[in-house]
Amino acid sequence: MALKAVCVLKGDGQVQGTIHFEQKENGPVMVSGSISGLAEGDHGFHVHQFGDNTQGCTSAGPHFNPLSKKHGGPKDQERHVGDLGNVTAGKDGVAIVSIEDPVISLSGDHSIIGRTMVVHEKPDDLGKGGNEESTKTGNAGSRLACGVIGIAQ
């Protein structure tokens, strides 16, 4: 049986979206959906530690990182569990999300249920920016929109 989750992204500005998650038993998580209101180009896309949006996206804390690793790209061995890389918005400001990730999960120790999905202002440099901030956040900049990931039917 597949596990499913959903996240509605909202921010202070125009950025909004809906992201769906689906995981078949012990398989990778399929992440799909769309985000609108973005500037054209790449935007960092991460699961953050807390499902707390009481002070907007800032109260979601750092990237979800239960293994205490450095920030990296989604295909890197050295990465936070929540590091999903970038989503790319076209000229229309819409990013179509289609990601398959074997590290995040909808159950167990790496479960993202109840945590916050965040889309960032700038591209994620995937930990290769050559400075300390790169190894923590990928220099992805401010948090444009976020939402808590919840269980879906």
Swiss-Prot record:
Q: GO CC terms on record?
A: cytoplasm; nucleus
Q: In terms of domain of life, where is this protein from? A: Eukaryota
Give the keywords, sorted.
Acetylation, Antioxidant, Copper, Cytoplasm, Disulfide bond, Lipoprotein, Metal-binding, Nucleus, Oxidoreductase, Palmitate, Phosphoprotein, Zinc
Q: Does the keyword Lipoprotein apply?
A: yes
Cofactor(s) required for function per UniProt? Cu cation; Zn(2+)
Q: Name one Pfam family in it.
A: Sod_Cu
Which residues of the sequence carry a binding annotation for Cu cation? Answer: 46, 48, 63, 120
Can you cite a GO biological process for this protein?
Answer: removal of superoxide radicals
Where is this protein found? Cytoplasm; Nucleus
User: What residues bear Phosphoserine in this entry?
Assistant: 98, 105, 107
Tell me the tissue specificity. Answer: Highly expressed in liver. Also expressed in testis and to a lesser extent in kidney, lung and spleen.
Q: List every position bearing N6-succinyllysine.
A: 4, 10, 91, 122, 136
Query: Main EC class of this protein?
Result: oxidoreductase
User: Which stretch is the leader sequence?
Assistant: none
The record's comment on cofactor binding reads: Binds 1 copper ion per subunit.
Q: Write the Enzyme Commission number(s) for this entry.
A: 1.15.1.1
Q: Which reaction does it catalyse?
A: 2 superoxide + 2 H(+) = H2O2 + O2
- Locate the N-acetylalanine modifications and list their residues: 2
Binding residues for Zn(2+), per the UniProt record?
A: 63, 71, 80, 83
Query: Which sequence positions carry the modification called N6-acetyllysine?
Result: 122, 136
In terms of InterPro entries, this protein maps to:
SOD-like_Cu/Zn_dom_sf (IPR036423), SOD_Cu/Zn_/chaperone (IPR024134), SOD_Cu/Zn_BS (IPR018152), SOD_Cu_Zn_dom (IPR001424)
- Where are the annotated segments for Disordered? 59-79
* Disulfide bonds listed in the record: 57-146
Instruction: Check the record and name the PANTHER family matching this protein.
Output: SUPEROXIDE DISMUTASE CU-ZN -RELATED (PTHR10003)
Q: Which protein family is it in? A: Belongs to the Cu-Zn superoxide dismutase family.
Q: Name the chain's protein.
A: Superoxide dismutase [Cu-Zn]
Species this protein is from: Camelus dromedarius (Dromedary)
Q: Which gene encodes it?
A: SOD1
